[in-house]
């Protein structure tokens, strides 16, 4: 209700990234921003078939809004594209029929991976990661001075039994 009240009070747009809605690990129910009463014209929901079904690079998703002005602006941008991802569209269409059991198995696997990752990270001296409540990634605090350089070092120089780790600096995802 707090978000809805702020959106209403200041007449803001609420961009709601709901691509990981199947991956909420707290037991809390998923509540879409589209169900917030009184701000229907302010909500812009972002969804992605490619993320839901682990189809990295397919880039097929949706932007959903009841706001006609926003919809028209988005359509102008979309119509300027010269080549929609036809193969990606075909893959995404087939993915929609994925059995519910598969999604449950994927959910269980992500919970297991999350628990393993967080447990391992938090055992390293100087490293801390909160337990993510959703999705399948974490933002960990590491004892390094420069996250960009550390991530590059992991890819170019780190080796453990012939393997490495790919990380991304959180600065690329957040402004705070």
Please report, for each region that a protein language model flagged, where it lies by residue.
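PLP-dependent class I/II
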Residues: 1-176
């Amino acid at each position: 209700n707090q978000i809805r009240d702020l959106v209403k009070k200041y007449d803001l747009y609420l961009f709601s990234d709901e691509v990981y809605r199947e991956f909420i690990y707290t037991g809390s129910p998923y509540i879409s921003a589209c169900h917030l009463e009184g701000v229907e014209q302010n909500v812009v929901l972002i969804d992605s078939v490619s993320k839901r079904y682990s189809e990295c690079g397919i880039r097929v998703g949706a932007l959903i809004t009841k706001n006609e002005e926003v919809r028209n602006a988005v359509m102008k941008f979309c119509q300027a594209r010269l080549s929609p991802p036809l193969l990606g569209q075909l893959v995404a269409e087939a993915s929609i029929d994925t059995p519910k059991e598969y999604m449950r198995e994927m959910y269980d696997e992500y919970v297991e991976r999350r628990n393993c990752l967080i447990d391992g990270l938090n055992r390293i001296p100087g490293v801390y990661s909160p337990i993510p409540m959703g999705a399948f990634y974490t933002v960990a605090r590491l004892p390094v001075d420069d996250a960009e350089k550390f991530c590059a070092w992991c890819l170019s120089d780190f080796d453990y039994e012939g393997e490495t780790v790919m990380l991304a600096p959180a600065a690329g995802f957040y402004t705070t």
